[in-house]
Amino acid sequence: MLHNNMITCNYVTCNYVTWIKGRFLMEYVEAVRDIKQINSIKKYLKKHSERDYVLFVFGINTGLKITEMLDIKVDDVFEKENCVKDFYLLSHKETLKEVYLNHKVKQAILHYVHTLHLSGENFLFKSSKTDKPITRQQAYRIIHHAAEAVGIEGKIGTNSMRKTFGYHAYKRGIAISLLQKHFNHSTPSETLKYLGISKDEKIRTEIDVNL
């Protein structure tokens, strides 16, 4: 039985199920492929909410599920007061998975935590009304409305952040086998479908070691 706050995701069609006005609404979401559109969303969120900006930057740079992101506390990503960790340790099926936090993520987190004076025990994506994290539905609305506000016509939701991470990682030369493992998919073809990439589609690879 589905509950009011449940969101499910099929890895091929990636449907979100949300309860709206007495009925369940299913919606397919896509990656944001255009870098200019990504930057437009960032700019919009930065202007309206530091927390929401960090949510988006964190999501598109780590590829974590929204449920995994909302569980994070400030102490989970900080080594000491002014130092964000290089890797966030995610508990996954009784094992620890290292999730790399790049410079953009670190910079966004550091500024956000210090600006809002968050303490170590606070959830990173804390509700403005309670000590709990924002809900999945609220996170969906944040990302969806930001995309609409900057004129993106595609279907964009929280899982778009995860797909955006995967699409751009693949475009920049990351092997599909590594992305398959990251997303916990059964086959490479499942990952390609999840990212919205057809087998015949030609993606211009941009391998940049940034030395």
Spans of model-derived segments:
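Conserved catalytic core of the tyrosine transesterase superfamily
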Residues: 3-211
